[in-house]
């Protein structure tokens, strides 16, 4: 922060041909001490990126100038949250807003064969059914009408059997094609050290796929009009979501405005982004503001999961019980996309091809912190996961650390 602040002060000083010492900063606005000139950080940058190297000599803000640090500051949001006045994502409304419920296939990779909406049309408040390839939703004037219409609608799917049996998950995981092998640590002669050890200890640890299971299922509101889209969402990554929505809606990302609204949180990525994609695409297809509220079954069934992890470990001890060899193998998902590239359900089902899935840094803490004479740690990055994945955020990877 000090380096960035100093760089911005220097830029303002150069613009005005004054000394940096003659400038002050308050609430992101740079002013001359005389008060005759002022400019905000954002106006000074004028859309340019701030690429600054860390300057260890950049002056720190004097503690006497601190207005908040060290003070007991009242939380302005707490009273409304305690009394129920606070506006959460699930409470957000727009004038003329319609309500949609998503109709999903019974399993991954399902293809929509036919739709019979005759019963759904009889629901009071029914508006229409929208479909784009395998993306299917029912739109109504109220949320309860959407729930009833979704239950009444009959869809026929063709669903391939692509998932392994639960009991055979880790055998399946171990046999998946490997995209990349990495030797994290390799010291000494692990083969001979283990062969000559007085005692060998082996263990295998498996970590099941996990859902975030936020207390409130995902919700989003979108309003597509005039060739652009505004989305209200509790997404933690609105910048990445903006890029993905651009692909789904086939419009420039500059035409998409993301507005954050507090919702049920998670450490990683749950269904907020996917629900936002649902709302945006349905709004585009019906030409009206749309609210999409996932049910608990939607959240647990269709949010991206943390991928499984499989860890094989073996140690060799000498006659005195001291470790002389350590070998570990990690079978983890290969993140073949960046954080900017996570395939939304709306993209997958509407026929938009997206590459990659983001899994987080699953290799963290695969290395050994202890000093042993013979160590071999390998990471096998698997080419596929069979289902959409995301990061269950534990910087340091709880499964690796536990093992």
Locations of the language-model features?
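Structural alpha/beta core scaffold segments of enzyme domains
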Residues: 1-403
């Amino acid at each position: 922060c000090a380096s960035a602040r100093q760089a911005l002060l220097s830029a303002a000083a150069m613009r005005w041909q004054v000394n940096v010492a003659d400038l002050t900063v308050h609430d992101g606005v740079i002013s001359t001490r005389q008060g005759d000139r002022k400019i905000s950080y954002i106006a000074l940058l004028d859309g340019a990126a701030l690429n600054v190297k860390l300057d260890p000599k950049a002056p720190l803000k004097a503690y006497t100038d601190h207005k908040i640090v060290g003070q007991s500051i009242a939380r302005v949001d707490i009273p409304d949250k305690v009394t129920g006045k606070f506006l959460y994502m699930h409470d957000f409304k727009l004038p003329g807003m319609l309500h949609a419920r998503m109709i999903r296939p019974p399993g991954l990779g399902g293809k929509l064969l036919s739709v019979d909406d005759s019963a759904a049309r009889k629901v009071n408040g029914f508006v229409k059914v929208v479909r784009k390839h395998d993306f299917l939703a029912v739109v109504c004037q109220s949320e309860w009408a959407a729930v009833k219409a979704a239950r009444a609608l009959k869809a026929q799917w063709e669903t391939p059997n692509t998932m392994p049996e639960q009991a055979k998950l880790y055998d399946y995981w171990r046999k998946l094609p490997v995209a990349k092998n990495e030797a994290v640590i390799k010291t000494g002669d692990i083969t001979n050290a283990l062969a000559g050890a007085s005692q060998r200890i082996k263990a295998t640890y498996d970590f099941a796929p996990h859902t975030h299971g936020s207390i409130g299922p995902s919700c989003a509101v979108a309003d597509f009009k005039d060739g652009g889209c505004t989305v209200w969402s509790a997404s933690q990554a609105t910048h990445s979501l903006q890029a993905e929505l651009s692909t789904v809606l086939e419009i420039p990302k500059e035409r998409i405005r993301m507005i954050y609204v507090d919702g049920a949180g998670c450490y990683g990525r749950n269904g907020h982004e996917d629900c936002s994609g649902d709302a945006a695409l349905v709004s585009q297809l019906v030409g009206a503001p749309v609210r999409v509220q996932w049910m608990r079954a939607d959240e647990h069934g269709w949010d991206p999961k943390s991928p499984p992890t499989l860890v094989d470990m073996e140690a060799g001890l000498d006659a005195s019980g001291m470790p002389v060899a350590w070998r570990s193998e990690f079978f983890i998902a290969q993140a073949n996309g960046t954080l900017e590239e996570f395939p939304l359900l709306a993209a997958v089902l509407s026929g938009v091809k997206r590459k990659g899935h983001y899994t987080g840094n699953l290799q963290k803490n695969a290395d050994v912190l202890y000093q042993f004479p013979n160590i071999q740690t390998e990471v096998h990055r698997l080419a596929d996961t069979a289902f959409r994945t995301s990061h269950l955020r534990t910087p340091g990877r709880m499964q690796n650390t536990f093992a």
